[in-house]
Amino acid sequence: MNDVVPPAAAESAAAGVSRIALGIEYKGSRYRGWQRQEAGVPSVQEALERALSKVAAEPVGVICAGRTDAAVHASGQVVHFDTAVERPLKAWVMGTNANLPADISVTWARVMPAHFHARFSALARRYRYAIYNDPIRPAHLAEEVTWNHRPLDIGRMREAAQVLVGTHDFTSFRAVQCQAKSPVKTMHHVRLLEHGRLIVLDIRGNAFLHHMVRNIAGVLMTIGAGERPIEWAKEVLEARDRRAGGVTAHPYGLYLVRVEYPGEFELPERYLGPHFLSGLPDIVG
């Protein structure tokens, strides 16, 4: 299913029309993902478009940088839309937020050149997958992290993750229903960070396949628990077969934290998120 947008929004803004970019954060727990669904099924896109349409007093459709799955969160989603309606940038932020549910927020707005595209102008995307590693499940972080009660050896996970850095065929880590034309993607870094009882998979790449981060997390947790050798990550990668890749990790711990664009667009960069990782240092690159 394609994003529901006015025809002009797909490529470049028409004459007399402004292209607006927005920063979006959301808690995805109660949504069937980013993408608009059939009537009555909640999605982040539908809620955002409805709120924007109220501010514009006309239908507004948006294009996003990356379509997140059901129950997946974002602290750094980026969207764009085209409109001939003139509103102060503050109205696109505050007015839209006034019409959004509490688990979705617009964080900034910018007027963009006509050639900016939230998806196709992006250079890289960055995700974080938060694992709460403790025998007792974290009630206050329910639906915000993945809970793993087994002791995980982060050293083993770090060593295994290094084989995923670089340009590879990630067929073993894509969902069966993935519609991407090519399974070849480039991972700039795949890091494991510690933050109290949390183990955080921090991964940055040019693009990602359907369920790719969750499948990587599943493999690394299995290795961290000692159920498979460190070399298993390489074996899974080289198999180029999803059946070799083990269990897909739960969506609750996954966050789209940043989308990177060429400097010419001068988009703001907020904290990486999620909020409970605010003390975790950012590692550039």
Predicted regions and their residues:
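Structured-RNA-binding interfaces characteristic of tRNA pseudouridine synthases
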Residues: 1-285
